[in-house]
Structures are given as C-alpha cells and as structure tokens.
A protein has these predicted regions:
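Structural motif
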Residues: 24-30, 53-57, 75-77, 112-116, ...
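Acidic, contiguous N-terminal accessory segments
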Residues: 8-72, 77-80, 88-99
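Short, internal active-site loops enriched in acidic
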Residues: 56-57, 227-230, 274-278
Length: 652
C-alpha cells in the first residue's frame, strides 16, 4: 500500500529545551496551523513537534503521537486530527517510542457552537468534535471556519411553527394559499398553524429548509420540531387521513425536509426531543408526545423512523425529559432500527443554577455514554450542547468549576470506558496544578449529588430554567417533569406521608454535609492555588449551600402540605405540621436575601466581566413559600379554625 504523507515541520527541537518553541515552516491546511498555535500556547518552549498527515484508512479520524530523540511526531489521518492532539497534550506528553494512539469510537461527534471568545478550532480541539451545529443558517464566515478546522457545518431549524419562523411571511403565504391554513385545536401548546394535508404547506416547508441550508452553504441541517410545533391541525382532511396525529405529522414533515435537501446533497439530522412530560403551562396543555409513558416514545416516532430515508439521522437526548440533574435514561434511543442514531447531551446549566453553581454531571455523563455507546454503535454519533441557558456570555471552556463537564464529555466520547478518577485528576491538574488539584477535584465531585438534591428532591423534577416556581400548582407539575411519576419509585416518592417528609429533609441534610466538606477541601487547597480561583470557588460553593438551605425549607414545606391535604381527605388535620411549615417560611424569609450574594466587582471565570453586571435569573423563593403557607393554612383552618394552627393539637 502506498501511503501519501505530507510533512508539517514545526521545529526540530528537543522536548526539554527551554528556548525556541513551535515554529512553522510549511503548512498545507489551516487546521494544522491552528494546532501548532495551540501547542505553542499550551506547551510553550518545552516541545518540538513534527506533524505528519497520513492518508491511511485506519487513522481516518484520530491521531497518534510518538517521540524519539526528544522530538514529538504527531500523525493524523485528517488535518483535524492535529487539533484533537493539541486539545489533550496531557495524555501524550510523556509518550516514548511506543506510540500513543487515539481513535474515535463514534463516527460523528456533533458540537453546538454559538457566540464564543474561543474559535471553532479551539472548540474542536477541546471537544474532539468533527461536526458543528450553528445557530440558524450560520454565517459564511462560521461555515468557512468549520471547514478550515476540517469539520462539517450544519444549519439549525428550531421548531416547525411557521409563525415563529416569521409571522409576516407566514401570514402573507397563507393569504396567497388559504387552503394551507390549519385548524388550531385550542388551548394547546402545539398549534395547528398550517395544514399538513395541503400541498402548499409541503411547498412552504421545503422552501424554508432549502433556503436555510443554502444561505451560508452549510453541509446539512439539524431540525427539531419542538418547542414550537405548528402542524397539529385538526381539520376534516387531517382527521380523515390521520394527519391530525403527531406520529403522522412528524413523519410527513421529515419527508418534506428530505425531499428538499436530497437534491442539494445536504445531510439531515432530526432531533427527537420534545418538551418534558405532558403538563399544563398557564392555560395551555403541553402534549410533549413521546414522554407520557414507557411505551409512547416509539409510538410517536416509529412512523418517522420507518418512512425516512436510510441516510437521515435521528438524534435523541439521553434524558427521558428536558431537564437535569440525573433524569431517567431515554426510552427511545436505540430504537430507530436501520437508521443512524446520535445520542445527545445538554450540559447547559439547566436545573443546576445556570452554571453559577458548581454542578458536576461527570458521573451521569459516564454512565449514559457507556449505555449510549451500546445502543448507537460505532456508525452512530454523539452530540454536545453547552451553555448557560438564557444567560449570554457564558464560556464553558473557561469555567473553573464546570468546565470539567465538557472535558469529561470529550474524554468519554473518545473512550466510553475511560476511568472517571483519571478524568478528574487530569482536569484538576490542568486547572489548579498538581498540589491543589486533588482536593479541588474531590470537592467538586461532591457537587453532582448536592445539586441533584437541591433541585430534584427524591429524584423528581425541576424547572428547566433553574427558577423557583411561583406557585404550588406549577411546582407540582415540575415534580413530574422528569417522568418518574409513572415509575414505582416516583409514585412512592410522591406519596403524601410523614415518612416522605423525613426523606426529603434527610436528603437535603446529607447534601448540606457534602457542601460543608466541599468548603473544607477548597479551604485546605487554597494556599496551593491562585487566590482568585479560591475566592470564586468558595463563593460559588457557598451559593450552593444557601440554595440547599432554601430548598430544604421549600421542599420540606411542600411535602408537609401534601401530607396535610391527604389528612384532610381523611377528615382530620395535624396542626403541628403547620407549625413546621411556618418555621420553613421563616427560614426562606431569612435566607433568600443571601441567595447569590456577592461583591459586584467579582470576576467570574465562566461569565465574561463582573458578576455584578449579570442578572442571575433564578427568581425569589418567597412567592412559592407564601403559596404553600396559604394553602396549608386553609387546610388546617377547615378543621381547627383560625387559631388551630397555633394550639399544637391533632384534630380528628
């Protein structure tokens, strides 16, 4: 076999020399140039490297590193392989004559890329991705940057409600094509803006995705049909043909997109995500098809799987809900037989404090990556969505607490069986140095369980915006949001008993003990780390502790209210429990001003600029606490009168 090799000479220096650096004499691809710059910035003068681009098929999407006579030789099957090597030098810098070999276990690793101070090349180096999802159509410059990094670029179409794409354009089209107007079901989050039975609707959708794909000449399009669904038409034609049902509407919409993109040679990735569990949002019912029960997922998507082009990719969240932390695993992933599937992770600050709180998801990522690998296989893919969730300016790669989540995803997406201890050690050493790293890693590992307890009591749900719910009814909807309500453990956790009140409180107390240990470990490590890093970590762990104190009172009071309701249905009440709710109210009133209390000039590693320049959008816990107290008072007074809450008696 003839191997075609192009040599990129970045210097012939001993790795131990203290002068010189990585210099560039001849480069044939910008990805190699970017990799050289990253190596220089990360390894400085202590490296000499020769890059070799090889066309060997067995090195198509990976790299290898060897070292002889003090010179590193990095071999890659494609130019992006050099970026992958530059993103994790801690894994190969001590290599000898026996090469360090890195091969990707998934054919595709998709990354969502938006506004960032870091370039596409830097993100590719950090995540090991080989495809990028842009916002909307992206720009020509962004697509060019992706191609310069030797990765594919995908446009993104959000939802299938034409009114949300552009109300004026939609109304004008419907005025010209009145038969395309749908019949709305009423009081539904999913709308019937256009009629899927009408040919003019199909033409509109084909034109939309065609324009999106060609605007910046992306390589393909990622589409998601929710949160804004506009094809839920209930007209006579749709009822007769069955196109008034979600499964049929999804299948026909995917078909339109395929018909538009195939002649252009563009690829299609369809996200199967919906909106958590079915629930009321204000006065509208969110159907969230596919999540109401264990067998509904395939019933919703099976028709689209079967009818789709074999080249269409289906991308499914590893979570069986649109929330974190620690939701149950997807019921749909691995069931699109004969189709390529991607597993998706959203490490976007949802329900973990919008990335302000320290919130590891490393253990969950490891468990789900290993499970997903068996379901999607080597020809499948993985996808990563990062961010602060409605908080602009968040830089996931710079966050000294939560960048470990991106780092772990990268390591696990290249080796699902990677040792989690090694991931933590390597990340903490990079960020904090060897002396402080071990203690900081031990501290931040505890945040995964602590944040889960603070936001998701007894494994039940929380709002995807991390906010405190404003009412009892909304909070109880959200308790079911992770879809455990139909599982035995979920039903048991929701039971209105004193035992469950005790379980909620005990879970919070254990988490508070974990945050105390986090604080102790960071204080012990502080003398060996940068003072600003120590200050930021101690502040953010303190925020988490205060959040736990408040959530202990809120969730304890809510479960007490549920107990009082159940007692009321039996014709009795327990005034002592109301007294406990009153004490919870005092705790929330006292501690709520301390939530996210900070020096306005403090700089945050994850968010650009001073913390005081940002609004931490978690809202106040007081409205929910007032509503709990008010409902509990009504229940007690029904049996014991206005003074009954104070006399400490149990009324029959």
């Amino acid at each position: 076999m003839i191997f075609h090799r192009i040599f990129f000479l970045f210097c012939v220096l001993s790795a131990g020399l203290a002068s010189g650096g990585v210099s560039l004499s001849d480069v044939a691809h910008p990805a190699a140039t970017a990799a050289a710059q990253l190596l220089q910035s990360r390894l400085g003068d202590a490296v000499g490297a020769r890059f070799v681009l090889s066309s060997r098929a067995d090195a198509a999407d990976g790299y290898s590193v060897s070292r002889a006579d003090g010179v590193y030789v990095i071999t890659a099957g494609r130019p992006r392989g050099f970026l992958y090597a530059a993103g994790e030098p801690e894994l190969w810098r001590d290599v000898g004559a026996t090469p360090f070999v890195r091969k990707a276990p998934f054919k595709t690793r998709l990354l969502m890329y938006g506004k960032s101070v870091h370039s596409v090349a830097e993100w590719i180096a950090a995540t090991g991705a080989n495809a990028v999802q842009l916002s909307g159509s992206g720009t020509s410059e962004q697509v060019a940057a992706c191609h310069a990094a030797d990765v594919e670029a995908y446009a993104f179409l959000y939802g299938c409600d034409p009114m949300k794409w552009g109300a004026s354009a939609c109304e004008a089209y419907l005025a010209a094509h009145p038969t395309a107007r749908g019949v709305d079901p009423g009081r539904s989050w999913e709308k019937g803006v256009m009629c899927p039975s009408d040919p003019a609707t199909a033409a509109f959708f084909r034109a939309k995705i065609r324009a999106l794909a060609t605007a910046a000449n992306a390589d393909g399009v990622v589409v998601t049909l929710w949160d804004t669904f506009g094809l839920y038409c209930q007209c006579t034609r749709c009822k007769k043909s069955g196109l008034n049902q979600f499964a049929a509407e999804i299948a026909v919409c995917v078909k339109w997109f395929e018909e538009a993109l195939k002649p252009l040679g563009k690829k299609l990735i369809v996200r199967t995500w919906s909106s958590g569990a079915p629930h009321f949002l204000r006065d509208e019912w969110v159907h969230a098809p596919g999540y109401a029960s264990a067998d509904e997922a395939i019933a919703t998507w099976g028709q689209a799987f079967a009818a789709s082009d074999p080249k269409t990719v289906f991308q499914t969240k590893v979570y069986n809900a649109d929330c974190q932390p620690n939701p149950p695993f997807s019921l749909l992933l691995g069931r699109a037989k004969g189709r390529t599937e991607f597993a998706e992770w959203q490490i976007a600050g949802q329900t973990v404090g919008l990335q302000w709180l320290p919130a590891s998801v490393v253990d969950h990522t490891a468990a789900t990556m290993r499970r997903a690998a068996k379901l999607v296989g080597a020809d499948g893919g993985v996808a990563l969505y990062t961010g602060g969730y409605n908080c602009s300016g968040y830089e996931a790669l710079d966050d000294i607490a939560n960048s470990v989540n991106v780092y772990a995803w990268r390591r696990l997406s290249w080796n699902p069986d990677e040792d989690v201890d090694a991931i933590w050690r390597d990340w903490a050493t990079k960020v904090y140095g060897a002396k402080a790293g071990a203690k900081v890693a031990a501290a931040l590992r505890l945040s995964e369980r602590a944040t889960a307890a603070s936001f998701s009591p007894l494994g039940l749900g929380a709002p995807t915006e991390s906010r405190f719910a404003g009412s009892v009814s909304r909070r109880e909807d959200l308790l079911r949001y992770t879809n455990r309500q139909y599982l035995p453990e979920g039903k048991a956790a929701l039971a209105p008993t004193r035992e469950n009140v005790a379980r909620v409180v005990a879970e919070k107390d254990a988490a508070l003990a974990q945050t105390d240990e986090m604080l102790r470990l960071v204080k012990d490590a502080a003398p060996q780390m940068d003072a600003a890093q120590a200050q930021e970590l101690l502040l953010r762990i303190g925020w988490l502790r205060t959040h736990l104190v408040v959530s202990r009172a809120l969730d304890g009071a809510l479960w007490r209210l549920r107990y009082l309701r159940a007692e009321g249905q039996l014709g009795r009440t327990d005034e002592k429990v109301f007294g406990e709710i009153e004490r919870d109210f005092e705790t929330v009133r006292r501690e709520s001003p301390n939530l996210f209390k900070h020096d306005a000039d403090l700089k945050s590693s994850g968010y650009c600029g001073a913390v005081g320049d940002r609004e931490i959008l978690l809202r106040s816990p007081l409205p929910l606490m007032r509503d709990i107290e008010s409902e509990a008072r009504k229940v007690v007074e029904r049996f014991a009168g206005p003074a009954g809450a104070k006399n400490g008696k149990i009324s029959p």
